[in-house]
């Protein structure tokens, strides 16, 4: 509906690219044209068709999970169904990885994009990582977002990286590649430009200190 309205009014009314609507043929042409790595970030608890289309389009990084893409976006969706649907996603990614480069799965660490206790973030990240690795995924990214405390963020990164490696080895998946993603501040930004600049710069320093494999940036 929103795609149709956008075309009729010649105004973009979509929050993102309608991948399923355009289909894999059109999307693959676009991916080939730009020749840049694309990460799928969507926000749906049932991503089965979306993931199939994404992989056929040439997208090799899939964000989300049964918890991190359920609680922040779809509070009325059944949790057990979300786990069942994402288990299918993990198997698809694992099987496709056998034919090509490993599909990187990434959990959405910021959760509700508000201040979440690091212990909750870490436990949820580990749960989604284990679900993914148990289905055969060989590349997984755990993540979390800036909290406002440099010390807390550094400790969170160290614990998350250490625990992820530990539990991956516990289930016989020590050969999996585990990456760390750091999200810059996900909450409301200060109205003062200098304060906002300081927030962005501080998060960049933290990402460097924890040696994040990827940083989700905020534009100025």
Model-flagged regions — what are they?
Residues 91-101, 130-139, 159-176, 209-213:
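Secondary-structure boundary elements
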Residues 152-170, 177-220:
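Active-site capping/gating regions of soluble enzymes
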